[in-house]
Amino acid sequence: LLSGFRADQLISSLNNQRDIDSAAAQKMVERLKNLGPKVIPRIIDAIAMSDKKHTVVYVDILASYVNDKTLNFFREGLSDGGERVVSGTVWALSSATNYNVNSLLDFFDDDEVSKPALMKVLKVHQNELSVHELLRHAYKVHAQEKAGLFNIMQEIITEDMVPDLINRMGGKDPSIKVHLMQVLAKFKRQDIHQVLEDQ
């Protein structure tokens, strides 16, 4: 409760600082970064009402809090109705590197989360994503997200993963098959040629 009150005070004071590069403003920023992850929802709310300069500062504070334990706090930011808040949350998650990006794939299960915003973050961190995890979620998401996940897969897939994808061609979902064929077509191999011929 006390940290929440302190956070509100600091945010209010920071909003009144015209020069966000001043020593006083920077001191407030550092204090907000040290208050702990419970301030994340308040920082997300602050973005909704802030100008461009202050938004940059709040995104920087948010990015400093991103880790595997705090990730669920950011779900709220991606679910917000305000474009500024969603964009700020995307920016923070895209800037941060101190977390397992594959955990974000679970956000597809949340109807409130903006899927285009989530896809933006995943694209930024695509080289850290697991093809196995992308596939697992591709079976569960809507057509547009499915296409997005397979586009990422196409970018990051390596040849050693080909046999697993070939095995999945025997599945019942026709849309998955079409996407798998597009991914596999990237490689010029006889076994792939044979599978594509058989479809």
Language-model region placement:
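HEAT/HEAT-like alpha-solenoid repeats
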Residues: R6, D111-S114
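Structural detector for internal amphipathic alpha-helices that build alpha-solenoid repeat scaffolds
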Residues: L1-L2, S12, N16, S22-L35, ...
